[in-house]
Amino acid sequence: TVLHAGGKFGGGGYKVSGGLHGVGASVVNALSEWLEVEVAKDGNIYQMKFARGHITQEMRIIGTTDQHGTKVTFKPDPEMFDTLEYDYETLHTRMREQAFLNAGLHITITDARIGSQDKPEKERFASMCYEGGIREFVSWYNRHKTPLHEQVIYMAGKKGDQTAEVALQYNDSFTETIVSFANDIHTPEGGMHEEGFKRALTNVLNAYGIKKGYLKNDDKLSGDDVREGLTAIISVKLTDAQFEGQTKAKLGNASMRTLVNAIVSDQLA
């Protein structure tokens, strides 16, 4: 119920966060008919309840546990929304992204809605865990294509509190597929991390071609040339992500251009 609060505020909550203004939980609470929060911490289970943003049950201990984590259950307020339907495929896609981006993380999603209009006849369930992380993400994107080399190329590095990893594989298509993320948030318009990757890839392949005699100095490949048939995943994590706009479609941190460029230049060469 407090604005500008959460993992990225106050320090020490999370190393990285995808939030911008610290209003997510508060907004969901305000737009819910009811919301319940359970937190497993220090051997106890704490519970607190709300209705349309107001406290209906103060925080109390409801049990003990040897686990830790947070459970949030809520019902959207029909007075605020014309429709309360959730799209399973949208949620499934988002959860699958998270599983790929965080190697070894186990995520399950269950759709228990059955028997009503536009609902399946049985419960839908998916369990996702990818030990290979973004390597497997690239393979998933290429699953209906023919790779030109068996192994997915993987590169990673860090500088201070910033980390970056890149995975790529060429296939027999003519299309370019570059999917980038910052703090596990999809950046469909790219940004500095994509710029660094594209620049390094072009420079490395041109340098290799010239060294091996495939290219002349005045006959270099363009960026479009080297990205034809490429599938690549770029994932960066940083403490102070600067997104352009509330939709977080583009990353603006110039330092990530430098870091990704250096990683690809050093490890792909």
Segments the model singles out, each with a brief description of its role:
Residues K15, F81, I185-M192, M256:
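Flexible beta-alpha connector loops of hexameric P-loop NTPases
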Residues D87-L91, H193-E194, M256, V260:
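Hydrophobic (often cysteine-bearing) scaffold residues that line and stabilize catalytic clefts
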